[in-house]
Design a protein with these regions (language model features):
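Cytosolic ligand/metal-binding cores
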Residues: 199
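Metal-cofactor-binding active-site regions of metalloenzymes
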Residues: 1-193, 202-208
Length: 210
């Protein structure tokens, strides 16, 4: 007996916060805020990108940063997670792990801790509305100093068991090897968090082993 794929139970184990945004939501929020979207975001969807070379990665990161800039207030953050949970439910997913780097939003929401609490509140509301369980992964930016990663790992540890389930590492892996952030991962390990660094995207299999 065959079953439609959408009805099969699933878990989505790694989804980036801004990257989860619906395209119509991105366009709508940008219009309301007077933010100009380049053609690659406004019309062509999904954008045609190559992440395997430096130029392609730079373009991807630029577009991602522009998309993130439309999330300027709490209602937008709540909306993003609510719509994401709705999409997950429609696809048969009962569990979502969503990754966010709080430093990308801290300037507009009053700091790292208020940003984490906002994301957790939005995740809780989205879960309650849809029945989809949501765990939050706090991620560090590998292009920044490892000390910043330690700060984020400690912050993530403070919310272990209260919605935060993991600690990650993202951005261009050619500019920051995972081993350089070992101290941050030790902090996260002591807090009982999952370790979910990106690897192998641009630097090959060796970066996964590191």
């Amino acid at each position: 007996m065959t079953r439609p794929l959408a009805t099969l139970p699933k878990a989505h184990l790694h989804l980036h916060f801004t990257g989860a945004m619906r395209h119509p939501t991105l366009v709508e929020l940008a219009g309301e805020r007077g933010i100009h979207l380049p053609e690659a975001l406004a019309a062509a969807w999904p954008p045609r990108l190559s992440g395997t070379d430096e130029r392609g990665w730079f373009r991807f990161q630029r577009l991602y940063d522009i998309a993130r800039s439309v999330l300027t207030d709490e209602p937008a953050m709540f909306r993003l997670l609510r719509e994401t949970a709705q999409d997950e439910k429609a696809e048969g997913s009962g569990w979502l792990e969503i990754q966010v780097d709080p430093s990308g939003y801290a300037g507009r929401f009053g700091g790292l801790t208020p940003t984490v609490e906002l994301v957790l509140a939005a995740a809780h509301a989205a879960s309650a509305a849809t029945g989809v369980g949501i765990g939050v992964i706090i991620a560090a930016n590998r292009t920044k100093h490892p000390l910043e990663a330690r700060t984020l790992a400690r912050l993530a540890g403070q919310y272990a068991g209260r919605g935060v389930i993991g600690f990650g590492l993202s951005n261009d892996e050619r500019r920051g090897a995972a081993r350089d952030f070992a101290a941050a991962f030790r902090i996260a390990t002591r807090a009982g968090l999952l370790l979910t660094p990106h690897g192998g995207e641009l630097a090959g299999p060796a970066s996964v082993l590191s």
